[in-house]
Amino acid sequence: DSYGNETIEEVTFTFIEEETQEVKVNSSYSTLDEVVAAVLQDITDNSMSKGQKARAIYKYAHSKIGYTGNSYTNSSEWQDEAFEALKVIKKNGYVAGDCFTYASVDRALLDGIGAECIWVDNQGARSGDHSWLLCNLGTGWYHFDSTRMRSGFSCFMKTDAEIQAYLDQGNYNYVRTVSKYPATPTTPYTY
Protein backbone atom coordinates (compact mmCIF):
# COMPACT_ATOMS: atom_id res chain seq x y z
CA ASP A 1 0.00 0.00 0.00
CA SER A 2 1.04 3.66 0.00
CA TYR A 3 2.65 3.29 3.48
CA GLY A 4 5.00 0.53 2.37
CA ASN A 5 3.15 -2.34 4.07
CA GLU A 6 3.06 -5.64 2.28
CA THR A 7 1.60 -9.05 2.95
CA ILE A 8 2.99 -12.28 1.63
CA GLU A 9 1.03 -15.51 1.57
CA GLU A 10 2.19 -18.85 0.29
CA VAL A 11 -0.34 -20.76 -1.77
CA THR A 12 -0.05 -24.18 -3.34
CA PHE A 13 -2.19 -25.11 -6.32
CA THR A 14 -2.63 -28.64 -7.58
CA PHE A 15 -3.96 -29.05 -11.11
CA ILE A 16 -5.31 -32.37 -12.24
CA GLU A 17 -5.75 -32.88 -15.95
CA GLU A 18 -8.44 -35.31 -16.97
CA GLU A 19 -10.34 -36.05 -20.13
CA THR A 20 -13.18 -37.68 -18.30
CA GLN A 21 -14.04 -38.36 -14.72
CA GLU A 22 -15.83 -41.61 -15.38
CA VAL A 23 -15.93 -43.86 -12.38
CA LYS A 24 -18.02 -46.98 -12.67
CA VAL A 25 -20.42 -47.01 -9.74
CA ASN A 26 -21.49 -50.26 -8.20
CA SER A 27 -25.22 -50.02 -7.81
CA SER A 28 -28.30 -52.13 -7.71
CA TYR A 29 -29.36 -50.74 -11.10
CA SER A 30 -28.51 -53.08 -13.95
CA THR A 31 -30.30 -51.18 -16.73
CA LEU A 32 -30.98 -47.61 -17.77
CA ASP A 33 -34.72 -48.25 -17.47
CA GLU A 34 -34.31 -49.27 -13.81
CA VAL A 35 -32.41 -46.15 -12.78
CA VAL A 36 -34.77 -43.92 -14.81
CA ALA A 37 -37.77 -45.47 -13.03
CA ALA A 38 -36.11 -44.89 -9.65
CA VAL A 39 -35.36 -41.23 -10.42
CA LEU A 40 -38.84 -40.58 -11.79
CA GLN A 41 -40.34 -42.15 -8.67
CA ASP A 42 -38.29 -39.68 -6.60
CA ILE A 43 -39.18 -36.53 -8.55
CA THR A 44 -42.68 -37.12 -9.98
CA ASP A 45 -46.01 -38.56 -8.94
CA ASN A 46 -49.17 -39.71 -10.68
CA SER A 47 -51.03 -36.47 -9.95
CA MET A 48 -48.62 -34.48 -12.14
CA SER A 49 -49.30 -33.61 -15.76
CA LYS A 50 -46.72 -34.53 -18.39
CA GLY A 51 -45.66 -30.86 -18.45
CA GLN A 52 -45.18 -30.82 -14.68
CA LYS A 53 -43.12 -33.99 -14.92
CA ALA A 54 -40.98 -32.45 -17.68
CA ARG A 55 -40.42 -29.38 -15.48
CA ALA A 56 -39.38 -31.67 -12.60
CA ILE A 57 -36.94 -33.43 -14.96
CA TYR A 58 -35.51 -30.09 -16.06
CA LYS A 59 -35.02 -28.93 -12.47
CA TYR A 60 -33.51 -32.27 -11.46
CA ALA A 61 -30.91 -32.38 -14.24
CA HIS A 62 -30.17 -28.65 -13.96
CA SER A 63 -29.46 -28.94 -10.23
CA LYS A 64 -27.77 -32.37 -10.13
CA ILE A 65 -25.26 -31.96 -12.98
CA GLY A 66 -22.38 -29.50 -12.84
CA TYR A 67 -20.84 -28.26 -16.07
CA THR A 68 -17.16 -29.13 -16.53
CA GLY A 69 -16.81 -29.18 -20.31
CA ASN A 70 -16.11 -32.94 -20.34
CA SER A 71 -18.62 -35.76 -20.66
CA TYR A 72 -18.88 -38.07 -17.66
CA THR A 73 -17.99 -41.17 -19.71
CA ASN A 74 -15.89 -41.84 -22.79
CA SER A 75 -18.90 -43.29 -24.59
CA SER A 76 -20.46 -41.58 -27.60
CA GLU A 77 -23.78 -43.30 -26.86
CA TRP A 78 -26.25 -41.13 -24.97
CA GLN A 79 -27.74 -44.21 -23.25
CA ASP A 80 -24.36 -45.12 -21.71
CA GLU A 81 -23.77 -41.52 -20.60
CA ALA A 82 -27.24 -41.28 -19.02
CA PHE A 83 -26.96 -44.66 -17.28
CA GLU A 84 -23.60 -43.95 -15.66
CA ALA A 85 -24.45 -40.33 -14.78
CA LEU A 86 -27.82 -41.22 -13.25
CA LYS A 87 -26.25 -43.98 -11.14
CA VAL A 88 -23.72 -41.49 -9.77
CA ILE A 89 -26.44 -38.93 -9.05
CA LYS A 90 -28.49 -41.57 -7.22
CA LYS A 91 -25.44 -42.51 -5.15
CA ASN A 92 -23.77 -39.12 -4.56
CA GLY A 93 -26.49 -36.59 -5.34
CA TYR A 94 -24.42 -34.91 -8.04
CA VAL A 95 -22.34 -35.57 -11.16
CA ALA A 96 -20.13 -33.41 -13.35
CA GLY A 97 -20.32 -33.43 -17.13
CA ASP A 98 -20.99 -31.39 -20.24
CA CYS A 99 -23.93 -30.68 -22.52
CA PHE A 100 -23.79 -34.31 -23.71
CA THR A 101 -24.31 -35.40 -20.09
CA TYR A 102 -27.23 -32.99 -19.61
CA ALA A 103 -28.89 -33.94 -22.91
CA SER A 104 -28.39 -37.66 -22.25
CA VAL A 105 -29.95 -37.47 -18.78
CA ASP A 106 -32.75 -35.24 -20.12
CA ARG A 107 -33.43 -37.70 -22.94
CA ALA A 108 -33.51 -40.77 -20.69
CA LEU A 109 -35.87 -39.17 -18.18
CA LEU A 110 -38.11 -37.62 -20.83
CA ASP A 111 -38.34 -40.98 -22.59
CA GLY A 112 -39.35 -42.38 -19.20
CA ILE A 113 -42.46 -40.16 -19.10
CA GLY A 114 -43.38 -40.95 -22.70
CA ALA A 115 -42.20 -37.70 -24.29
CA GLU A 116 -40.99 -37.65 -27.88
CA CYS A 117 -37.44 -36.33 -28.26
CA ILE A 118 -35.20 -35.28 -31.13
CA TRP A 119 -31.49 -34.78 -30.53
CA VAL A 120 -30.19 -31.40 -31.76
CA ASP A 121 -26.52 -30.63 -32.36
CA ASN A 122 -24.98 -27.21 -32.80
CA GLN A 123 -21.92 -27.88 -34.91
CA GLY A 124 -19.06 -25.42 -35.10
CA ALA A 125 -20.53 -22.47 -33.22
CA ARG A 126 -18.10 -19.90 -31.84
CA SER A 127 -18.80 -21.20 -28.35
CA GLY A 128 -18.08 -24.78 -29.42
CA ASP A 129 -20.39 -27.64 -30.17
CA HIS A 130 -23.55 -27.99 -28.13
CA SER A 131 -26.26 -30.64 -27.82
CA TRP A 132 -29.82 -30.32 -26.60
CA LEU A 133 -33.28 -31.71 -27.36
CA LEU A 134 -36.49 -30.85 -29.09
CA CYS A 135 -39.25 -32.28 -26.93
CA ASN A 136 -42.90 -32.97 -27.71
CA LEU A 137 -45.18 -33.50 -24.73
CA GLY A 138 -48.27 -33.64 -26.94
CA THR A 139 -48.57 -29.96 -27.88
CA GLY A 140 -45.74 -29.59 -30.39
CA TRP A 141 -41.96 -29.53 -30.40
CA TYR A 142 -40.13 -27.22 -27.99
CA HIS A 143 -36.44 -26.74 -27.17
CA PHE A 144 -35.41 -28.49 -23.94
CA ASP A 145 -31.95 -28.04 -22.45
CA SER A 146 -31.18 -28.28 -18.73
CA THR A 147 -27.52 -27.28 -19.26
CA ARG A 148 -26.47 -24.45 -16.96
CA MET A 149 -25.78 -21.41 -19.15
CA ARG A 150 -23.36 -18.69 -18.08
CA SER A 151 -25.96 -16.13 -19.09
CA GLY A 152 -28.53 -17.70 -16.77
CA PHE A 153 -30.79 -18.52 -19.73
CA SER A 154 -33.35 -21.20 -18.90
CA CYS A 155 -34.17 -23.39 -21.89
CA PHE A 156 -37.27 -25.19 -20.65
CA MET A 157 -39.72 -25.79 -23.49
CA LYS A 158 -38.73 -22.74 -25.56
CA THR A 159 -40.14 -21.80 -28.95
CA ASP A 160 -37.99 -21.10 -32.01
CA ALA A 161 -38.78 -17.38 -31.52
CA GLU A 162 -37.57 -17.49 -27.90
CA ILE A 163 -34.39 -19.26 -29.01
CA GLN A 164 -33.89 -16.69 -31.79
CA ALA A 165 -34.29 -13.83 -29.27
CA TYR A 166 -31.55 -15.46 -27.19
CA LEU A 167 -29.33 -15.80 -30.27
CA ASP A 168 -29.99 -12.16 -31.17
CA GLN A 169 -28.38 -11.16 -27.86
CA GLY A 170 -25.06 -12.55 -29.13
CA ASN A 171 -25.34 -16.07 -27.75
CA TYR A 172 -24.38 -18.94 -30.03
CA ASN A 173 -25.30 -22.11 -28.14
CA TYR A 174 -28.43 -22.79 -30.17
CA VAL A 175 -27.23 -22.04 -33.70
CA ARG A 176 -28.50 -24.86 -35.88
CA THR A 177 -29.74 -25.64 -39.36
CA VAL A 178 -33.36 -24.74 -38.64
CA SER A 179 -34.71 -26.55 -41.72
CA LYS A 180 -33.45 -29.90 -40.36
CA TYR A 181 -35.87 -29.80 -37.41
CA PRO A 182 -39.62 -29.42 -36.94
CA ALA A 183 -40.79 -25.89 -36.20
CA THR A 184 -42.04 -25.15 -32.72
CA PRO A 185 -45.44 -23.63 -31.99
CA THR A 186 -45.46 -19.83 -32.03
CA THR A 187 -46.91 -19.53 -28.54
CA PRO A 188 -44.82 -20.11 -25.40
CA TYR A 189 -45.29 -23.44 -23.66
CA THR A 190 -47.74 -23.62 -20.77
CA TYR A 191 -48.44 -26.53 -18.47
Per-region residue spans from a language model:
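Short, solvent-exposed loop/turn segments at the edges of extracellular beta-sandwich modules
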Residues: 1-5
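C-terminal edge beta-strand
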Residues: 9-17
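Extracellular adhesion/carbohydrate-binding repeat motifs centered on closely spaced tryptophans
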Residues: 16-18, 122, 128-129, 133-135, ...
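Low-complexity, Pro/Ser/Thr- and charge-rich linker/hinge segments at domain boundaries
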Residues: 17-27
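Secondary-structure boundary elements
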Residues: 26-92, 186-189
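Conserved active-site-adjacent core of cysteine acyl-enzyme catalytic domains
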Residues: 74-113, 121
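Hydrophobic/aromatic-rich core segments of domains that either
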Residues: 101-166
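Low-complexity, Gly/Ser/Thr/Pro-rich intrinsically disordered linker/tail segments
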Residues: 156-191
